[in-house]
């Protein structure tokens, strides 16, 4: 009897050790996903990934706005919001891989991740300057960042033997009609009028498909023309009720008058479907949603009142095209 108990104890002990070992292996694999070097990200056809889908307010489930346009091993980021390093890691895109960053404008929500990508990507390492193209105001922003980080950059680079160029930025300011070719990808900019600062929408094509990315709430007619017939439009949408609509609901808003100001600053979720219909696009990808969607169906139902194409309520890391 004692022998049986001893044997049973051994079996239980082995099972416990196996269970613990499996847990350790699983945790090790999980850690490797977080910290191990990444292979270059590569796709066979023009693709779009929503690296960050949040807006200007904090949200632990959504990083700041950034959209990755990829073709082969070429990665172009449209805007670089907060949490960009973590967003790219989750998307399995090495931080030193993006060939180009294009900005829609220099509002903080579009640029808060620039220093993060610059300095964290330098450690991968990045051997060449990080390249940024944006509207007027981009150069001043970049020069200010480089000045602010000068002492820390010098100390980090010399201590770790990093290539100096990898911690610097090559910046180009552009305006309406800008165009360039990058590894089989045609990139075009269109100025969107009517806003408080220079703003660009961006179009990408590989000769077969066309993608348009915009983040502003102004210049809608120009944007509709620029995006005309595109396969995908990546755009913001916000539901911001008026003070009158809030009256009687019991909802407490600290600064209700600011809602009206913000409504003029963003594209209403009640209007974005009309924009997509006017542009005759095949697929509308919604990002920067304000407030964040509780249920995707609610958003789709509202937008579908004015748009019959495909509606995608994107999350961080989603591949939304093809």
PLM features: residue spans?
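Binuclear metal-dependent hydrolase catalytic cores
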Residues: 2-212, 223, 298-321
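Cap/insert and terminal regions of metallo-dependent hydrolase folds
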Residues: 3-9, 16, 210, 218-317
């Amino acid at each position: 009897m004692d022998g049986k108990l001893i044997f049973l104890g051994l079996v239980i002990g082995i099972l416990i050790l196996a269970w613990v070992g499996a847990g350790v292996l699983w945790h090790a694999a999980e850690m490797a996903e977080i910290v191990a070097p990444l292979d270059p990200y590569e796709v066979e056809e023009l693709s779009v990934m929503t690296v960050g889908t949040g807006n200007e307010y904090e949200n632990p489930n959504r990083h700041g706005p950034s959209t990755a346009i990829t073709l082969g091993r070429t990665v172009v980021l449209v805007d670089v919001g907060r949490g960009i390093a973590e967003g790219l890691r989750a998307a399995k895109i090495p931080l030193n891989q993006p060939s180009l960053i294009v900005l829609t404008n220099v509002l903080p929500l579009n640029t808060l991740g620039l220093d993060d990508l610059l300095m964290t990507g330098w450690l991968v390492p990045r051997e060449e300057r990080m390249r940024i193209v944006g509207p007027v105001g981009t150069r001043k922003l970049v020069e200010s960042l480089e000045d602010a980080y000068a002492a820390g950059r010098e100390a980090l680079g010399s201590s770790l033997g990093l290539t100096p160029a990898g911690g610097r930025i090559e910046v180009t300011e552009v305006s309406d009609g800008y165009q360039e070719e990058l590894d089989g990808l045609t990139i075009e900019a269109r100025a969107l009028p009517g806003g408080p600062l220079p703003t660009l929408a961006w179009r990408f094509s590989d000769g077969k498909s066309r993608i348009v990315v915009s983040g502003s709430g102004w210049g809608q007619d120009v944007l509709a023309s620029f995006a005309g017939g595109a396969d995908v439009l990546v755009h913001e949408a916000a539901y911001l009720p008026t003070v009158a609509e809030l009256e009687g609901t019991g909802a407490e808003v600290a600064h209700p008058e600011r809602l009206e100001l913000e409504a003029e600053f963003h594209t209403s979720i009640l209007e974005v479907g009309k924009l997509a219909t006017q542009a005759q696009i095949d697929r509308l990808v919604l990002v920067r949603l304000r407030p964040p969607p509780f249920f995707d169906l609610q958003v789709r139902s509202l937008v579908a009142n004015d748009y019959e194409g495909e509606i995608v309520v994107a999350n961080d890391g989603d591949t939304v095209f093809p």
